[in-house]
From Swiss-Prot:
Coiled coil spans: 81-247
InterPro entries per record: THO_Thoc5
Natural source organism: Bos taurus (Bovine)
Nuclear localization signal, short sequence motif: residues: 7-10
Compositionally biased tracts (Basic and acidic residues): 22-42
Protein name listed in UniProt: THO complex subunit 5 homolog
BP GO annotations: monocyte differentiation; mRNA export from nucleus; mRNA processing; primitive hemopoiesis; RNA splicing
Modified residues (Phosphotyrosine): 225
Length: 683
């Protein structure tokens, strides 16, 4: 036990000469502990220069002590451990000094940053005040300019010349001695003379009105006399009817047409009756006529489907009995197809005349074996149109009536029973025959009173007059709207192909006065080419790029920047707006996938299209969208920040007034144009 206790050494306590003995606490130490100590307050009292000198001195002392410790360890000796311990304690004290200096330095740095932030906030506040003051100055300057440019209404009055005024005006009005030297009094005198002349003319006007009333009374008396002759004329006309019938007068043509209508098949007859009634009641510009051979129609004394079935049965028997006729199987199928797709000899022709003297010629046919109606369309205008290259499909018979109602493209039969008939003769689809037979649109069937239930296919369908009457007015209005819309697009495309975006006077307020970007190319593209573009994948995947739509490519340029716009034009334009997809080639390729501002430009054209419709019926929507696209490109390029590493002036100087160049973390640019102030802002 004694040996173990002797091995345990008590730790040595080394005190400096000036340090107080451990365990003895003086009164002054107790008072200091009661006070609050703060290094942040001490920073304000200390001199940074002296702290720096203390730092250098402490580092030098540490270097010296480390060297001495190294020297003592290398020499060894009995008293070396005590000296090394002494120097170690001194080094610890110096390290504590360095830590304190480090804390003080961090506190000074934080205070410096806080002071810098406060100063920056003050500068930002002053800068905002300066911008507000500049805006107020600009507003006041505009108001001053308006006041200076103000024109009084008396300036719009066309006064007589000075020579005529002093020659004709009485002296009490002209007052030559006063007005000769005073332009203000001269103007007042001329206005007084103008007022006097207008009073005299007003008196003459009242006299003329009284004379007019007298003449109108005389006219009424004569009209009453003439109206008394009407009953006599009617009786004379009634008595002359046998003579008119004997002489075959032209009015008998309508009666003949009604006689011909008796030989129409039921769907065409319903169409003829309802269209004639609609023309007499609502649209005097609608003319209805019947074309075709009446004799051939009379020869159809029995249902053609029965004879066709009998023929098919006899052909089947012949094929079973003999093998020599097998090589003519293709010819037989062609004959069967022709018989299957045979049209009725009579057809109904509707001429729908629009306000601009353009006429839509509709010829309705009835396929007897398929029990469906088809239509062929043709548009004629009062003046011959020069067809642009991009407008080739607008008035083509294959597309002019496509999707008059949504989804009604007229490429397949609306009668479900026809598919079983097609299987017998090897017809895959009716799409291959619509150019010759016409398009079997659903609205055509409804105008003929035909309705085909999809759940229970029926071969024989009864026509319904009420179905035709309920769809007649709506369909006629849609047809007129479609023709006017296509003709408007036809004229616009002629300008677009020459790089001119036609903007009517009613729509000038939608755009700034100066638009630098210009349209350089407008061409039509195929549906396959549109789907292969890399920046149109979103539209294709969303199902908005159908094969019934029309597709175009526009190119807008300004300087080195080129903006491509792929346009999807729905057949229902302008009730359904076009869809634009953009790709900007400037400092790289930018689309809506890698540039939020390109997405914002597409939103301005596609989403905010109602601002660009213009006056009803909105045929200027497409050209207004293209003009808006040119304006958006100007804003995009002019608000782009200038690269300081590039020498020379900015390629696109800012000419548009913008309240704020960027907004939000995505730095969206101000694309909304505010009329009549003329500045751009964010939405």
């Amino acid at each position: 036990m004694s040996s173990e206790s002797s091995k345990k050494r008590k730790p040595k306590v080394i005190r400096s000469d000036g340090a107080p003995a451990e365990g003895k606490r003086t009164r002054s130490d107790t008072e200091q502990e009661g006070k609050y100590y703060s290094e942040e307050a001490e920073v304000d009292l200390r001199d940074p220069g002296r702290d720096y000198e203390l730092y250098k001195y402490t580092c030098q002392e540490l270097q010296r002590l480390m060297a001495e410790i190294q020297d003592l360890k290398s020499r060894g000796g009995k008293d070396a451990a005590v000296e090394i311990e002494d120097r170690r304690i001194q080094s610890c004290v110096h390290f504590m000094t360095l830590k304190k200096l480090n804390r003080l330095a961090h506190i000074r740095l934080k205070k410096g940053r806080d002071q810098t932030h406060e100063a920056k906030q003050k500068v930002d506040a002053y800068h905002l005040q300066l911008q507000n003051l500049l805006y107020e100055v600009m507003h006041l300057q505009k108001e001053i300019t308006k006041c200076l440019e103000f024109k009084s209404k008396h300036e719009e009055i066309d006064l007589v010349s000075l020579e005529e005024f002093y020659k004709e005006a009485p002296p009490d009005i002209s007052k030559a001695e006063v007005t000769m030297g005073d332009p203000h009094q001269q103007t007042l005198a001329r206005l007084d003379w103008e007022l006097e002349q207008r009073k005299r003319l007003a008196e003459k006007y009242r006299e003329c009105l009284s004379n007019k009333e007298k003449i109108l009374k005389e006219i009424e008396v004569k009209k009453e006399y003439l109206s008394s002759l009407q009953p006599r004329l009617n009786s004379n006309m009634q008595a002359s009817l046998p003579v008119q019938e004997y002489l075959f007068m032209p009015f008998d043509q309508a009666h003949k047409q009604y006689e011909t209508a008796r030989h129409l098949p039921p769907p065409l007859y319903v169409l003829f009756v309802q269209a004639t009634a609609y023309g007499q009641a609502c649209d005097k510009m609608l003319s209805v006529a019947i074309e075709g051979s009446v004799d051939e129609a009379k020869a159809l004394f029995k249902p053609p489907e029965d004879s066709q079935d009998d023929e098919s049965d006899s052909d089947a028997e012949e094929e079973q009995t003999t093998k020599r006729r097998r090589p003519t199987l293709g010819v037989q199928l062609d004959d069967k197809r022709k018989e299957m797709l045979k049209r009725h000899p009579l057809s109904v022709l509707l001429d729908l005349k629009c306000k601009d003297d353009s006429v839509l010629h509709l010829t309705f046919y009835y396929l007897m074996n398929l029990n469906i109606m088809t239509v062929k369309a043709r548009v004629t205008t009062a003046t011959e149109l020069i067809t642009p290259i991009s407008a080739g499909d607008l008035l083509s018979p294959d597309s002019v009536l496509s999707c008059l109602y949504p989804g009604d493209h007229g490429k397949k039969t609306p009668n479900p029973a026809n598919q079983y008939q097609f299987d017998k003769v090897g017809i895959l689809t009716l799409r291959d025959y619509v150019l010759d037979l016409g398009h079997p649109y659903l609205w055509v069937q409804k105008l003929g009173g035909l309705h085909f239930p999809k759940e229970q296919p029926q071969h024989t369908v009864i026509t319904d007059h009420s179905l035709s009457a309920s769809h007649m007015e709506t369909t006629m209005k849609l047809l007129k709207t479609r023709v006017q819309s296509r003709l408007a697009l036809h004229k616009q495309f002629a300008s677009l192909e020459h790089g001119i975006v036609p903007v009517t006077s009613d729509c000038h307020y939608l755009f700034p006065a100066k638009v630098v970007s210009r349209l350089v190319k407008w061409v039509t593209i195929a549906h396959e080419d549109y789907t292969e573009l890399h920046f149109t994948k979103d539209i294709v995947e969303a199902g908005l790029a159908g094969d019934t739509n029309l597709y175009y490519m526009a190119l807008v340029e300004r300087g080195t920047a080129k903006l491509q716009a792929a346009v999807v034009l729905n057949p229902g334009y302008s009730s359904i707006p076009p869809i634009f997809q953009l790709c900007l080639n400037w400092k790289g390729e930018k689309t809506n996938n890698n540039d939020d501002n390109i997405r914002a430009m597409e939103s301005e054209v596609n989403v905010c299209y109602k601002e660009l419709c213009g006056p009803r019926p909105g045929h200027q929507l497409l050209t207004n969208q293209l003009q808006r696209l040119c304006v958006l490109l100007d804003v995009y390029l002019e608000t782009e920040s200038h690269d300081d590493s590039v020498e020379g002036p900015k390629e696109f100087p800012q000419e548009k007034m913008c309240l704020r160049l960027f907004r939000g973390p995505s730095r969206i640019k101000p694309f909304k144009y505010n009329h009549p102030q003329g500045f751009f802002s964010h939405r």
